[in-house]
Regions:
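C-terminal capping/lid segments that line or modulate ligand- or cofactor-binding pockets
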Residues: 1-46, 310, 321, 352, ...
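An extended acidic
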Residues: 1-81, 149, 154-183, 250-276
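Short Pro-Gly-centered flexible turn/kink motifs
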Residues: 65, 114-115, 208-231
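Low-complexity, Ser/Thr/Pro/Gly-enriched N-terminal "stalk/linker" regions
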Residues: 1-12, 20, 163, 182, ...
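Helix-terminus loop motifs that line ligand-binding clefts
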Residues: 65-70, 75-77, 293-302, 312-313, ...
Length: 646
């Protein structure tokens, strides 16, 4: 699984696969709807030469990926020595129009003149619909091929530099009735020029080139997205009239302007990390919908195996994504996210497990009925706490009093009241909820740390608002939680933080001593534990138990973590966020050498575009799960920011 190139204008988002093919097309939200879900919906790119066709996903092609220096514009170099062809792509999603732009430099690597035909293929399951009611039609007068279903319309077109449009086309059914798709029509270099079809449909267009020995030509391709035929044809005609090159220039200019705060900071970043820092910042922006949702990952590859994907807004993940942006001075993204959370907030004051980009509840495997026999909302309390804590940090950073006017009564008060009330009076700890890793219903050290930090921060805001009732109530609960946590969640004999406590059916609690790095990190970063000597010892205990080595500084989430593990008896996968947490701890302690070794190792595991996966297999070194994972990118940025001398 990987999308080494992500392109976005915060409404249309496109993911390119390791073969340089369009594999995810999200519209009209980032993360929703994916119109290329499932097998065979990738948009193939093929070259016919010397009597046969070769697709980029075939053997023989090697692809190199990069981003332009200061813009979310992808660059791909695809070479096939066997057929003597090189394709150089520059790719972008236009920042003003909902359209994917691709310029393709087709190079003949042989000395003789050759007939070369470039094929661009489009395949959709529009709106993630299983109803097979899509339509594809050729519009010869507009030099476009359109795909539509209801209020989702796409228009594909292209020109050879000099103005000539595609010269052949084919439309048809794929994945049904024994048909593989219209791309197979290109096997002989010719297309059928069929003009309309409905059902599960695809299309292919051809550009015919005559390339001199070691010569080249450039093909310009675009795919417009809209909610009506009129809209996509308007975009299509603008690309033609303005030229694709002008649209690339406008898009590059927009990104250069947006990157100004990050570039200012990057001047103080070590040169070897500077480009990865900038790229990671752009990747975060690419996953933020203009209406506020922050998507965890748009890598839709898991859907090819009929699993759910990560194209949701987890409030907690969003907090970690937004924090480095706030630190660099970005305002709009956080403001829109808080608006999103305010709209999503339940009447009781909590946020749910995860959300779709349109604000609706996301899919969830969490039950209302819990192992201890209780029935309660299936929430992860740390998500509500994290958002509240981030808002307080955001306000402190900006000093913008209009934030309190807009959000204090409508979001801060209900969140803080919920957190203060969701406490077990016997333990003075938060009641059980699902843990950070979405697996266990229990009281965790990590969640406890976030709750007390959020309540302390909210109490400080209440002081500024002269809300004495809120300030006293929230600070009192926070102090009780912190005091109780130091007694119940730290094991002085093991010199370790517990994962947490599991509530039994009779209301008592049983300690869970599983070593979990989130417990250590939560206690450290959210100030849960005052005894610094014990805190340092707990971290060392964790590192010893995990046989940690700086030479290969990978760490799992917790003991015996089976998620994406290659085999039942294999070691648990390493998570980049956990290694970066440790680097942040080292920096706080003044151990810059150890931190830099971790940062360097993480950077070495990234794609050339800076893309980081969620996990890697510690044995094979293979990336696992989605890539990019915004949380990984964000922790990389946060750690780099921590290295900068204030």
């Amino acid at each position: 699984m990987a999308r080494p190139i992500i392109l976005s204008n915060n409404e249309l988002q496109v993911g390119l696969s390791r073969h340089g093919e369009v594999s995810d097309v999200y519209f009209p939200y980032v993360g929703l709807e994916n119109h290329t879900i499932g097998g065979n919906t990738r948009h193939r790119v093929g070259v016919w030469v010397d009597g046969r066709v070769s697709w980029l996903s075939d053997d023989g092609w090697s692809c190199k990926f990069s981003y332009h220096h200061e813009a979310l514009i992808g660059h791909i170099v695809a070479v096939n020595e066997q057929i003597g062809i090189m394709l150089e792509f520059d790719d972008a999603v236009d920042t003003d129009f909902n359209v994917l732009l691709r310029t393709i430099h087709v190079v003949n690597l042989r000395p003789e003149t050759r007939d070369v035909r470039l094929f661009m293929h489009q395949a959709f399951i529009i709106g993630d619909s299983g109803s097979s009611t899509d339509t594809v039609q050729v519009l010869p007068n507009d030099n476009a091929v359109i795909h539509y279903r209801g209020r989702r319309v796409f228009a594909a077109s292209g020109q050879i530099d000099g103005g000539k449009f595609f010269d052949q086309y084919a439309v048809g059914v794929f994945g049904r009735e024994g048909r593989e798709g219209t791309y197979r029509d290109a096997d002989d270099g010719e297309l059928s020029n069929s003009t309309a079809e409905h059902g599960r449909v695809d299309s292919t267009i051809r550009f015919k080139l005559e390339l001199a020995g070691h010569g080249s030509a450039r093909v310009n391709y675009w795919l417009a997205a809209g909610t009506s035929l009129r809209e996509v044809l308007y975009i299509h005609k603008n690309i033609i009239s303005q030229t694709i090159h002008k649209r690339f220039e406008a898009t590059a200019k927009w990104w250069r302007l947006w990157l100004r705060p990050a570039k200012k900071v990057a001047q103080r970043v070590k040169p070897e990390y500077r480009q990865a820092f900038i790229n990671s910042t752009m990747l975060l922006k690419a996953h933020i919908d203009k209406r506020g949702a922050v998507i965890a990952s748009s890598d839709g590859e898991a859907l090819n195996y009929q699993r759910d994907a990560y194209a949701y807004c987890w409030p907690r993940d969003s907090v970690y994504v937004l924090w480095p942006l706030i630190r660099m001075g970005y305002i709009e993204e956080a403001y829109n996210f808080f608006d999103f959370c305010r709209r999503a907030l339940s009447p009781k004051g909590y946020l749910s497990h995860k959300y779709r980009a349109d604000g609706a509840l996301g899919s969830s495997w969490h039950s209302y009925v819990h192992p201890d026999g209780t029935v309660s909302a299936p929430i992860q309390e740390d998500e509500t706490a994290s958002v509240l804590f981030l808002f307080c940090q955001f306000y402190n950073k900006t000093g913008d009093d209009t934030l309190l006017q807009r959000f204090y009564t409508s979001m801060i008060v209900p969140m803080a009241n919920f957190l203060a009330s969701y406490v077990d009076n016997r333990t003075h700890l938060p009641k059980p909820s699902y843990d950070l890793w979405e697996e266990h219903f229990m009281v965790t050290t990590y969640t406890t740390a976030t709750v007390q930090a959020a309540l302390f921060a909210a109490a400080n805001l209440a002081d500024q608002r002269r809300d004495e009732v809120g300030a006293v109530a929230w600070r009192t609960v926070a102090e009780d939680i912190k005091q109780s946590a130091q007694k119940r969640l730290y094991d002085p004999h093991q010199k370790a933080f517990r994962k947490g406590l599991r509530r039994n059916k009779n209301g008592t609690y049983t300690p869970d001593d599983t070593l979990d790095m989130s417990a250590v990190y939560g206690a450290f970063i959210y100030g849960l534990y005052d005894n610094q000597e014990d805190l340092h010892q707990a971290i060392q205990t964790a590192l010893d138990r995990f046989h940690f080595k700086l030479e290969t500084p990978g760490l799992p989430r917790y003991e015996d973590d089976a998620y994406y593990r290659s085999a039942p008896d294999a070691p648990s996968n390493w998570w980049f966020i956990v290694s970066l947490w440790l680097a942040q701890y080292y920096l706080e302690c003044g151990d810059e050498n150890s931190a830099q070794r971790i940062i360097s190792w993480v950077a070495s595991q990234a794609w050339p575009t800076g893309v980081l996966s969620e996990q890697i297999d510690p044995v094979s070194g293979r990336e696992c799960s989605v890539a990019p994972l915004c949380w990984s990118q964000a922790e990389f940025i946060s750690t780099i920011l921590d290295t900068i001398k204030r």
